[in-house]
Structure formats: structure tokens, C-alpha cells
Amino acid sequence: MSMNPIHVVGGGLAGSEAAWQIAEAGVPVVLHEMRPVRRTDAHHTDRLAELVCSNSFRADDWTGNAVGLLHAEMRRLGSIIMSAGDAHQVPAGGALAVDREGFSQAVTERLEAHPLVTIAREEIAGLPPQDWDSVILATGPLTSPALADAVLKLTGEDQLSFFDAIAPIVHFESIDMDVAWRQSRYDKAGPGGDAAAYINCPMTEAQYEAFIDALLAAPKAEFKEWEHVPYFDGCLPIEVMAERGRETLRHGPMKPVGLTNAHRPDEKPHAVVQLRQDNALGTLWNMVGFQTKLKHGAQTEVFRMIPGLEKAVFARLGGLHRNTFINSPRLLDGVLRLKAQPRLRFAGQVTGVEGYVESAAVGLLAGRFAAAERLGRPAVAPPPTTALGGLIGHITGGHLEGGSGSFQPMNINYGLIPPIAPPKRDAEGRRLGAKEKTRIKKRLVGERALADLEAWLSGAQAVAAE
């Protein structure tokens, strides 16, 4: 029996994941990606699922971190993004970071090889054709003006935009390891068991103050078209953080806690700049939290003030790209359909989630929902006790009150998942401290989430077997 394909517009993380989930459900899918026909300022290749900002999927521990729990849930649901990430991971302490080239190449090759996936290299300008009865719009942070305007006219909603900034990448051989040293914060080992996954560059108080002075005085790139657009707090440029207070960076990405200078163990650094491995070869390292909109000449001058980076050679300098998202709680139903035109679904960053994993997670759900409908089955969201359920709950039901602009992009966090009261005493009857209670509570939330996800998945499989 022939079946009309589902169309997915956008070949980023969300679109790639959505297409994979649809095809794995046995439904044909056409994945439309405008590159290379039309390029963007943020992308550098024509591959699917290209990572344009950091190479980190963040913490991977499902027992102690909400994004780690999201990782675990996505793995259970056969995520192509998590599978490719696991296959191409690079050392990153307690985080899951990936070789960006190998990762996107793997996603591209697997989708190209799938018999139910057709990849169309073309731009879909404006709303998709009316005869496409099931469409997922996963157009990402650089949604084309034509499509954005069409959605605005359809819904009557105001468009919301903000900046995302990109951090520089440094060639390893140009880092002075007689000054810098390798260590993960608190010597915490990551998925690969490496407790020395970061390169650390120390600063004295005088060096830090001089760095802040230079940072504040450096010329910044002008983006007049977007000059009144707000930043997303999770991706603030370092110069914007510095403008909020001279100590802000020292308590943010440059905090020295949990680190000991291997060359001078008796001297406590006033601040530390960390670099994280960016590719499998270990030849490229990105400056953690150093997203910036400084002009390129100023970046090389200011960042070479950092001890250990005096002769740094940059493979990529920092920059900015725009992010556009819709007012999802008003516009979308509980299974990500546009209320004004239910044949259209949205997925990824355009829905108001922030982060690679979150974008892929919403793509995963959109793909499963669309495939279920095509197969005549009910599209049912995961339980709110799961990370996936908490995330979709935020974008389809969160922040309706508070007026214009109250709905803002959100990373996955425990605040989106119903809490569990931890025990007050341990097995020996000793009263638990606050830190121990928090640790136990996070683990209990994770255990409940995975059990509830399993029950939800079993229910979906039972319906499919009928």
C-alpha cells in the first residue's frame, strides 16, 4: 500500500531527528534542506545536523543532571542524534562532547542510506504547498523571512528574536602547555573516563583586571538590523557579561573553583579560561563560554592576553547569529501542531527550546507524533514526569500569563519536571544533609522518568500491534 510521505523542512538536528523517527516507524519522509542552494552565515558545510555553535551536548549523567536524563530518554527511543553523538564523542569531563565533523557526516550518511528517506536540496519559501498534508517545520534559528512572515500572517502573533553567539576555536599546537594544564573541574571523569578533559589557562588578579579592561574597550561588530534584539541568557557574549559587572566572568565561565594549577599548585588562580576538545584528533579546542561579538581583529588581540594563549592560532573566531522562535504556548497544541493549520507541526529551536539536545528532542517527538497519525494511531505526548514530557509541556503550555514576551527559550531543567520528596534519613537512620537530599532527589526523578517512559513506550507499542 502506497503512503503519502511526511515532509520535514530543515535539515538541522531537529529535522534530521524527526525524519529518522518517521522513517524508522515505517513511513516515507522527504527531508528538505536549503543548503547548498541557499547558504547561511552560521553554517560552514552542506551536511545535515551541522553543529554551528559549541560541540557539547552538556552533562551526560542521567542520575544527576536534567540534560543527562534527556540523553537517556532519547537513547531509549532510538535517537539518531544521540547515537551519532555517542559514536563520535571526544573527551569532555562529565559532559558529552562530539567531533562535529564526524558527527554531522554520520547523521548525513545514515539518513541518505535509509530506504524511506528522500533528501531534497531546495528552499521552501513561505508556507508549504497545500497538498502536503503533514509537514514538520524544523527551520531552526535562521528561519527564512518568507516563512516567518507567512506564519505571522497565519497566526497574528508577534515574532520574537534574539542573538546566539559563537565561541572561538584554537589550534592545540599553538597553546603554551608550559603555562596551561589539563584538568576537569573537581577532577570529574566523563563518559570516556577522562578526568583531565579540559585545558586550563590561569590568570592572576592583575591579568584578569587588564583582560576585563581590554574586553570592555574592544570594538564590537555592529548588527544594525538586529540592534534592539535581546540576547538569550544561556549564550551571552562575554563582553556583555563583563558589562554587567567586572566580577561576572570570574563567577561564570572563568570561575577558578575545582582547579589546581599543575605548574604552580601552591598558587590559586584568580580566574581560569577553559578550553574543551572540539574534534576527535584533539587538534582543535574551543574556548568554553567565550561566545563573542567582538570584531575579529579585536578578538585575536584580546584573547592573546590570556596566559597560555599568547601565540594562539585561531581556526575559527567568534561571531553571532540570529535566533527566531514562535510563541509556542499560544500557537501549538499538545502534540506540536499549529492550531491555525494542524497539518503543520513545528520542531526544534523555532519552538522556543534552547540547546542542541533539546532541539533534537522536540524533533524526535514531532517525528513520532506525525508518524503515529499517518499510521492511524493516536499521537500521545510522553508523561510530564519525563524530561521529554517536561520539555514539551513547557513549549505547549508554559508561560501563557505575563503579557508579550513572557515566553522565552528554555533549556531542560528539573524545574520542568514534577519534583519528588527525598527521604529525610539514610538507611542507617542518619539525618541527610541538603546536598545529599538533592543528589538523592535527582536520582529518584531520573528513575521515575525512565520507568514512566518505558510504560509510555510499551503503551504505544501495544497500540501498534493491534
From Swiss-Prot:
Recorded GO CC terms: cytosol
Compartment(s) where it occurs, according to its Swiss-Prot or TrEMBL record: Cytoplasm
UniProt cofactor(s): FAD
Name this polypeptide is given: Methylenetetrahydrofolate--tRNA-(uracil-5-)-methyltransferase TrmFO
Keywords: Cytoplasm, FAD, Flavoprotein, Methyltransferase, NAD, NADP, Transferase, tRNA processing
EC nos: 2.1.1.74
GO molecular function: flavin adenine dinucleotide binding; tRNA (uracil(54)-C5)-methyltransferase activity, 5,10-methylenetetrahydrofolate-dependent
